[in-house]
Amino acid sequence: MDFGKYIAHRGLHSELVPENSLTAFRLAVEKCLSIELDVRLTKDCRIVVFHDNDLMRMCGIEGKVFDYTYEQLSAFKLKNSDEKIPLLSEVLKTVDGKVPLLIELKDGAPFGELESRVDHMM
């Protein structure tokens, strides 16, 4: 399988399937597409899969990802769906090594914490 030709950027998303959602990642795996995703740390240092620094575009909520704990973030829905912001661990379990992942680290303070935590998971 040639995984390098097409990459599902933030998963295989559409009008009905939000980017960086577990459904978008499942669909990419079903189509045997490599996946690019972005990770950030929450206030309580959990690794979530989310592209933007702030929550407005995807969740309609004021504030940055780092301003909230994962428990708080998990109550927010992605766009107009029932999908929530996934943990990296949930995405890794969903993908289960079936397709290549390109993980972009969206780092902020504290510098090095995200890198260390992602490295430990791999």
What label would you give each PLM region?
Residues 1-122:
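Phosphate-group recognition and catalysis centered on beta-loop-alpha active-site segments
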